[in-house]
Amino acid sequence: MRLYPAIDIRNGQCVRLRQGQFHDVEVYSHVPANIAMQWEGQGASYIHIVDLDGALAGHSVNDEVIKEIVQTVSVPIQVGGGIRTIQDIEHKLNLGVNRVIIGTKAVENPQFVKEIISTFGADKIVIGIDAKNGMVAIEGWEKVSNYNAVSLALEMKELGVSTIVYTDISKDGMLQGPNIEHTKEMVDLTGLNIIASGGVSSMKDLEELDKIKVSGVIIGKALYERRIELENATRLFEQ
């Protein structure tokens, strides 16, 4: 099980939101690249970046910061937030990012997913499914759709997708533990590589997720608040 330390970027800074609320922000660092270096130093084998401004604006906003992170660390990086066009994807990959996460666009236009998988390959494209009580949320979490998350994942699988970041937004940034039940459903019913995200607060949460066979876990606030020591966690779960 791979652990992905999360770096959320807003106005060029490393921040955390509570439950995806853009007005509820905590700033952790003015230099996100330093944070990336810190996580790499503690054993991170992959880093997860979200351009929060991008997610809201619908186009890339913090590319300079992302580029700086890519140039600072040697581990691979995945990026999400505001990536909606083929040009966006090309641009991100040209910055040196290893793979991109597509969210809203996948819900709105499955044909686009098919196209980008055939253009870039399934290893470069991750689909982000954000859900609230099993239903898909879109547009930077501002709207909840009438799409069931598992159905959407299965539809993506048909299109050639192999990896999904599954976020339960009722849990995100709240440190209340992940939604094991819905995540397990995702793993069992889709057979895809599921990267769990949202609510991870302790080593116990990581054990629970490891048991249900997720392929990875994104850890945010719990790392910043030292509830999980990345070095220990990596040693336990990535070996």
Swiss-Prot record:
It comes from the Bacteria. InterPro entries: Aldolase_TIM, His_biosynth, HisA_bact_arch, Isoase_HisA-like, Isoase_HisA-like_bact, RibuloseP-bd_barrel. The keyword Transmembrane helix does not apply. It is an enzyme of class 5 (isomerase). Signal peptide: none annotated. GO terms for biological process: L-histidine biosynthetic process; L-tryptophan biosynthetic process. Its main location: cytoplasm. It is found in: Cytoplasm. Coiled coil: none annotated. GO terms for molecular function: 1-(5-phosphoribosyl)-5-[(5-phosphoribosylamino)methylideneamino]imidazole-4-carboxamide isomerase activity. The keyword Cytoplasm applies. Its EC number is 5.3.1.16. It catalyses: 1-(5-phospho-beta-D-ribosyl)-5-[(5-phospho-beta-D-ribosylamino)methylideneamino]imidazole-4-carboxamide = 5-[(5-phospho-1-deoxy-D-ribulos-1-ylimino)methylamino]-1-(5-phospho-beta-D-ribosyl)imidazole-4-carboxamide. Pfam families: His_biosynth (PF00977). SUPFAM superfamilies: Ribulose-phoshate binding barrel (SSF51366). Pathway: Amino-acid biosynthesis; L-histidine biosynthesis; L-histidine from 5-phospho-alpha-D-ribose 1-diphosphate: step 4/9. GO terms for cellular component: cytoplasm. Gene3D superfamilies: Aldolase class I (3.20.20.70). The active site is at 8 (proton acceptor), 130 (proton donor). PANTHER family: 1-(5-PHOSPHORIBOSYL)-5-[(5-PHOSPHORIBOSYLAMINO)METHYLIDENEAMINO] IMIDAZOLE-4-CARBOXAMIDE ISOMERASE (PTHR43090:SF2). Belongs to the HisA/HisF family. This is 1-(5-phosphoribosyl)-5-[(5-phosphoribosylamino)methylideneamino] imidazole-4-carboxamide isomerase. It comes from Lachnoclostridium phytofermentans (strain ATCC 700394 / DSM 18823 / ISDg).
